[in-house]
């Protein structure tokens, strides 16, 4: 299988390439310097030259606060750029897997107490320009490719590559000065480790299953609880992790965050594919890989 990956230098693109390499796939990694998704001609030219069987569109502008301050760029890259990649995939007859986000939801949760998880069939309602631009990308991909597209929503994506919350907390856990670390405790979701996400996405690509899928590791928690678990996994003192309300963070963040964006992998369970493992096991695997 010949696979083209956008966001080739990002944490998910790098992990996905490793999974594909181990499976014997022919992988072409495209960083922004190789393929500018906001430029339609660039997308058509590069994809046309590579002629992949599958396009993994992991490239995006994921700076949530940056998107809030520059919404034009957010929609150009995340929404229109996804249209360009879908058009390019259609021209060569490739399947496309688009990586979306839990930020397409408003964060009020489901159920009477608002603590329930979102399924693929719950209505989205993004509260930030980042979330709206990612939802726009979903619409563009579905409109262009229909059943030749698979949309994967992931939440709190972390892993051994790139810059992410897990690696930041692991570095702080290993800080010999032992300073306290403040972490938000009023936002809940599910971590998604790239090692597990990449495996499931490749299965979806090979199975040629279309539609929308939530793919996150099982088990909801707060950012503070996640940080504390990372400290414990690293053998550090978890009491150094101090809870703080998101509204009390300084400097104030421009973009609102969903208070509860727990994803229910309902479609994945119903598809017959292996379910995502718990985040606890994925966490210890990731710590072992880096320490």
Q: PLM features: residue spans?
A:
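Mid/C-terminal beta-alpha module of Rossmann-like enzyme folds, strongest
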Residues: 179, 200, 207-253, 287
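Conserved C-terminal active-site "lid" loop/helix of NAD(P)H-dependent oxidoreductases
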Residues: 222-228, 246-291
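SDR active-site strand-loop-helix element
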Residues: 6, 30, 55-59, 96-102, ...
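NAD(P)-dependent short-chain dehydrogenase/reductase
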Residues: 139-189, 194-196
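NAD(P)H-binding glycine-rich loop region in Rossmannoid oxidoreductase-like domains
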Residues: 40-79
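N-terminal Rossmann NAD(P)H-binding glycine-rich loop of SDR-like oxidoreductase domains
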Residues: 3-22
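Adenosine-cofactor binding site in Rossmann-like domains, unifying the SAM/SAH pocket
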Residues: 21-45
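Catalytic helix-loop patch of NAD(P)-dependent Rossmann-fold dehydrogenases
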Residues: 69, 76, 80-84, 104-152, ...
């Amino acid at each position: 299988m010949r696979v083209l990956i956008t966001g080739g230098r990002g944490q998910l693109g790098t992990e996905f390439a490793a999974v594909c390499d181990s499976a014997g796939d022919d992988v072409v990694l495209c960083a922004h310097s190789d393929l500018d998704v906001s430029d339609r001609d660039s997308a058509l030219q590069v994809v046309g030259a590579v002629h992949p069987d599958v396009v993994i569109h992991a490239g995006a502008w994921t700076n949530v606060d940056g998107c809030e301050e520059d919404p034009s760029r957010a929609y150009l890259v995340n929404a229109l750029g996804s249209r360009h990649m879908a058009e390019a995939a259609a021209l060569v007859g490739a399947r496309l897997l688009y990586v979306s986000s839990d930020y397409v939801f408003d964060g009020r949760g489901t159920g009477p107490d608002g603590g329930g998880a979102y399924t693929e069939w719950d209505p989205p309602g993004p509260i930030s320009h980042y979330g709206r631009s990612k939802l726009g990308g979903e619409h563009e991909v579905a409109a262009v490719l229909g059943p030749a597209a698979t949309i994967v929503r992931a939440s709190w994506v972390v892993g051994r590559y790139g810059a992410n919350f897990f690696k930041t907390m692991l570095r702080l856990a290993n800080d010999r000065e032992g300073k306290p670390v403040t972490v938000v405790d009023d936002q809940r979701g599910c971590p998604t480790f790239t090692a597990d996400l990449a495996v499931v996405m490749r299965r979806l690509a090979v199975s040629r299953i279309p539609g929308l899928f939530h793919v996150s590791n099982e088990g909801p928690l707060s950012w503070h609880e996640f940080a504390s678990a990372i400290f414990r996994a690293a053998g550090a003192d978890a009491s150094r992790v101090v809870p703080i309300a998101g509204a009390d963070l300084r400097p104030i963040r421009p973009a609102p965050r969903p208070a509860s964006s727990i994803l229910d992998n309902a479609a994945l369970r119903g598809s017959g594919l292996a379910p995502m493992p718990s985040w606890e096991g994925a966490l210890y695997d990731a710590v072992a890989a880096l320490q």
